Amino acid sequence: MKLIRILIPLLLLAGTSYVISSCSKEKTNSRLSVYLTDAPGAYDAVNIDIVKVQIKASSDQGDDGWQELPVNAGIYNLLEFKNGMDTLLSSIELPAGRISQLRLILGGNNTIVLNGSTFELPLETPSAQTSGLKFNIHADLVGGAEYKMWIDFDCARSIVVTGNTSYKLKPVIRTFTEALSGAIKGNVQPAAAQATVYAISGTDSLSAIPDAVTGDFLIRGVPAGTWNVVADGNNGYLDQTVSGVAVTLGHVSVVDTITLTP
């Protein structure tokens, strides 16, 4: 029986991906890697309590058929995972075939740090602690192939302000795969501009915060098409737009350095 190796790492802005490579000489195993990533938010830390990750092979929409993966459960600060950084959550071998869904189950120890103060972040949807957050995958895993998947946890949209010093967590998450998306990378200067970078196409928008030292940014999970890249400056620096950036599946589109001026 062919087996599939499933790896579940952790990342910071954008979704889900599949990459094919040899896994053994006999090509009897396949590997699925799942990463957690985060869209930027204006916080010092966003601590998410990850309890379980499960997968489902059947197309049944009921609550049966879920298989729990061996996961390095714990509290992860999403803001530590950006511009390509990640951490492995799980590794498992499974029979080759179709995976229809993935489920992420969160715990109750979620917090944010804002201006040096820590605030509890209760889940607005309690089912995220019981039935979990479900994602449709519909991946046909083949022996000898490697599959990578990203889950994009959007911090800014996931945190709901309910009072002067009270917040709730309402997870806004998307998934993407390398095989079905591209990426945009570049650099924004100067660091003093503290810019946020947006990729915009029609009503769709994705974002990233450049590295505070180098100014480098990477936006993953970008659908194929033509995008405008906007560097939104702060501290008196003017915005700048790079129009017509072409994105193709499985490739990284590189934007020339964007220099903002006061």
Give the label of every model feature segment:
Residues 1-8:
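Bacterial N-terminal signal peptides that target proteins for export
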Residues 10-13:
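Hydrophobic alpha-helical membrane-embedded or membrane-associated segments
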Residues 18-22:
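C-terminal motif of bacterial Sec signal peptides marking the signal peptidase cleavage site
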Residues 24-244, 249, 255-262:
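A short, solvent-exposed, low-complexity linear motif enriched for acidic/polar residues
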